[in-house]
Design a protein with these regions (language model features):
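Conserved acetyl-CoA-binding loop-helix of GNAT-fold acetyltransferases
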Residues: 87, 93-106, 133
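Conserved acetyl-CoA-binding loop of GNAT-fold acetyltransferases
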Residues: 131-141
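Residue-level recognition of the GNAT/N-acetyltransferase active site
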Residues: 83, 88, 92, 121
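Conserved GNAT acetyl-CoA-binding A-motif
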Residues: 101, 108-119
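Extreme N-terminal starter segment of soluble prokaryotic enzymes
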Residues: 1-2
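Conserved beta-strand-loop-alpha-helix junction that forms the acyl-donor binding cleft
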Residues: 114-127, 144-147
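A short, glycine- and basic residue-enriched loop/turn
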Residues: 79, 128, 141-142
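Acetyl-CoA-dependent GNAT
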Residues: 5-12, 16-77, 83
Length: 147
């Protein structure tokens, strides 16, 4: 297993994995080109997407976002947020998710961030077990709200 940061050069391989996840079938070789919006997102300095490469294809990814904090309370250090973590079902339980989660720890150290945060569905027992194994603890009572 190799972990790679997703960028403009390897995005099509990443898109193949996402297409398979969403549609259950492989994408045709002549997949779509990278849109200007996607180019902008991939070059966002606060977005970090890492993918697990196995046998020439991506089988999982983690999407991390660094959100800086301002003011003396935070000393200019922000938080890393785990936006998404996914591993192909046939590769689960083999250390891929833990290795991808390690990238969050590495990024926290690299950016001198205050901490790592994530949201998890209370009914997703496999994810809860993984996050606890990675050192995460439940903190407070929070409502997840969207508009």
């Amino acid at each position: 297993m190799t972990i790679e940061r997703v960028d403009l050069n390897n995005y099509s391989l990443f898109e193949d994995m996402v297409y398979w996840r969403e549609n259950g079938i492989e994408r045709s070789p002549a997949g779509p080109s990278i849109s200007e919006q996607m180019k902008n997102e991939l070059t966002n300095p606060n977005l970090y997407i890492y993918a697990a490469l196995e046998d020439g294809r991506y089988v999982g990814w983690i999407s991390l976002v660094y959100i800086p904090k301002v003011g003396q309370r935070w000393n200019g250090h922000g938080h890393i947020y785990v936006d998404e973590l996914w591993v192909e079902p046939g590769f689960r339980g083999k250390g891929f998710a833990k290795t991808l989660m390690k990238k969050a720890d590495d990024l926290k150290s690299e950016l001198n961030a205050t901490g790592i945060r994530l949201y998890v569905n209370v009914n997703n027992s496999a994810a809860l077990k993984l996050y606890e194994h990675c050192g995460f603890q439940e903190e407070g009572n929070t409502y997840f709200m969207k508009k």
